[in-house]
């Protein structure tokens, strides 16, 4: 998405940066993991296909993605590649003003440190304020209990469940109260 092509979002513990072609090799290495493929319902891609996917994320107006950097690590080394820990995405349906949000903390050492929590909150706020989303959905593998619980803590409710596909769809309608609550959460993270 060109809207976020020059945006850098600073959090307390993370930085969200646009997905650029120089991020692709590390991202490609992550996606070779069978665990990540299973948790994200992804198929392995060749490196060339991954570059095409990155280009699509950059150019398509119905997709928004950021690479998640560990802010402390980036502060020490100044290297985005070395600091990468995951990504967060929104698939946008402009007609209904709905965004399907995704989060992946690929770096196992970064898991359990609330960096995914902080990333999702910042991405939700970005979608509300800049893309003007009115509703969010999260489609999550039934095996990814941690992610399901995180979205439930963000007040997402179950919309549907597919045993065939092994996933649950959670939904949250944006309200002024929820927006204020998200802003308070970001303030408390600082």
Q: Where do the protein language model's features map onto the residues?
A:
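A general structural signal for well-ordered secondary-structure junctions
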Residues: 36-37, 63, 157
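Long, contiguous hydrophobic alpha-helical segments, chiefly transmembrane helices and signal peptides
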Residues: 40, 50, 57, 103-105, ...
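A short gly/proline-enriched turn/hairpin at secondary-structure junctions
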Residues: 36-44
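Acyl-donor (CoA/ACP) binding surface of acyl/acetyltransferases
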Residues: 1-25, 29-30, 72-190
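Active-site rim helix/loop that mediates acceptor-substrate recognition in acyltransferases
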Residues: 43-65, 70-77
């Amino acid at each position: 998405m060109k809207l976020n092509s020059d945006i850098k979002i600073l959090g307390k513990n993370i930085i969200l940066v646009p997905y650029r072609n120089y991020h692709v090799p590390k991202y490609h290495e992550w996606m070779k993991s069978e665990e990540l493929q299973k948790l994200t319902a992804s198929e392995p891609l060749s490196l060339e296909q991954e570059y095409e996917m990155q280009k699509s994320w950059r150019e398509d107006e119905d997709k928004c993605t950021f690479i998640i950097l560990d802010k402390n690590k980036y502060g020490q080394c100044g290297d985005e590649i070395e600091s990468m820990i995951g990504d967060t995405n929104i698939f946008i349906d402009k007609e209904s003003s709905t965004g399907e949000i995704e989060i992946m903390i690929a770096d196992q050492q970064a898991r359990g440190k609330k960096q995914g929590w902080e990333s999702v909150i910042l991405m939700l706020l970005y979608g509300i304020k800049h893309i003007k989303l009115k509703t969010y959905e999260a489609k999550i593998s039934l095996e990814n209990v941690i992610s399901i619980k995180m979205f439930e803590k963000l007040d997402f409710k179950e919309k549907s469940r597919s045993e065939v596909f092994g996933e649950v769809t959670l939904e949250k309608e944006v309200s002024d109260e929820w927006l204020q609550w998200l802003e308070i959460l970001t303030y408390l993270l600082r």
